[in-house]
Amino acid sequence: MIIAFIRLYQYCLSPFLGPSCRFSPSCSHYACEALARHGATRGLVLSVWRIMRCNPWSRGGYDPVPAEPFR
């Protein structure tokens, strides 16, 4: 269900906003992968942490979803 909302954002809203994410993969793609790989709770925590780091003062760059659950 959460991934459906992210996909809706990706296809309906994101094209009008233009590229603004400082990371690769984009924050919305990261969130979908984190949710699929780690489940709702950990996936949401990882996604929120990523979105908080995506700001003008961040260097950005390549930041993949961690393979192992964080502790």
Swiss-Prot record:
Name a single GO cellular component: plasma membrane
User: Keywords on this record?
Assistant: Cell inner membrane, Cell membrane, Membrane
Which Pfam family name is an example for this entry?
Answer: YidD
Q: Does the keyword Plastid apply?
A: no
Q: Which InterPro entries match?
A: Membr_insert_effic_factor_YidD
Q: What domain of life is recorded for the organism?
A: Bacteria
Membrane topology field? Peripheral membrane protein
Q: Does the keyword Lipid biosynthesis apply?
A: no
Query: Where does it live in the cell?
Result: Cell inner membrane
Q: Which family does it belong to?
A: Belongs to the UPF0161 family.
What does this gene product do? Could be involved in insertion of integral membrane proteins into the membrane.
The protein's name: Putative membrane protein insertion efficiency factor
